[in-house]
């Protein structure tokens, strides 16, 4: 909204001489979210998966081709027993995957607080020439119905399925099968097992931060006498 100058009175003053400050009240946050959602065609009165389906359905009046083109795998949740599954990778991300991860290194990690809905997000990343992380693919899926904890709503099978779809997507139309040689994860055995299922010869490394965290937590337990 700053770039589009849509805040109140922003279009009426001289930017070179303006000395203006905006005071945001607690009530402004919800109003800004509503304006943002409306400007992006998000209907907050319906479930998020229904918004997504409207964007990728060519027959929907809310169809958005750029979103449809960025999704290489989509499974709607039509019944309570099913999961919503969305795999996202733009053309630029596909090119980066071949440049930075094929016959090289990939990083896989998950996060569980991406929104108020019970959704899990796993991100595949590569490392560029400057040593910075580059997103290669996003794997978004819902927790099973009745699952009490979102962070426990996944297993080796669902990760294997989504990683295999990513591999198939990247390898389509090419003479070479997409294959990273090394993967870095945290200590989650489900992530590590799924990677080995899709690429049996891959070398698995532990993230140094998570490894140090495990050692620290275990040391605290031992020193506190809580380890039996």
Predicted segments, located by residue:
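DNA-binding interface regions
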Residues: 1-228
């Amino acid at each position: 909204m700053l770039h589009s100058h849509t805040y109140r009175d922003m279009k009426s003053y001289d930017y070179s001489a303006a000395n203006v400050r905006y005071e945001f009240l607690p009530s402004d946050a919800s109003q800004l979210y509503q304006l943002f959602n409306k400007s992006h065609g998000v209907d907050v009165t319906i479930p998020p998966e229904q918004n997504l389906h409207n964007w990728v359905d060519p027959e929907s009046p809310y169809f958005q081709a750029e979103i449809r083109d960025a999704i290489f795998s989509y499974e709607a949740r039509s019944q309570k027993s099913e999961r919503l599954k969305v795999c996202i990778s733009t053309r630029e991300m596909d090119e980066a995957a071949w440049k930075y991860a094929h016959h090289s290194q990939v990083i896989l990690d998950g996060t569980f607080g991406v929104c108020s809905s019970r959704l899990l997000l796993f991100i595949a990343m590569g490392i560029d020439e400057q040593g910075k992380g580059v997103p290669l693919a996003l794997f978004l899926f819902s927790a099973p119905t009745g699952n009490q904890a979102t962070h426990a709503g996944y297993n080796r099978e669902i990760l294997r399925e989504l990683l295999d779809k990513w591999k198939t997507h990247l390898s389509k139309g090419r003479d070479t099968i997409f294959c990273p040689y090394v993967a870095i994860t945290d200590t989650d055995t489900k992530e590590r097992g799924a990677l080995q299922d899709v690429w049996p010869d891959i070398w698995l490394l532990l993230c140094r931060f998570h490894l140090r965290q495990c050692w620290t937590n275990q040391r605290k337990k031992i020193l506190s006498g809580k380890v039996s």
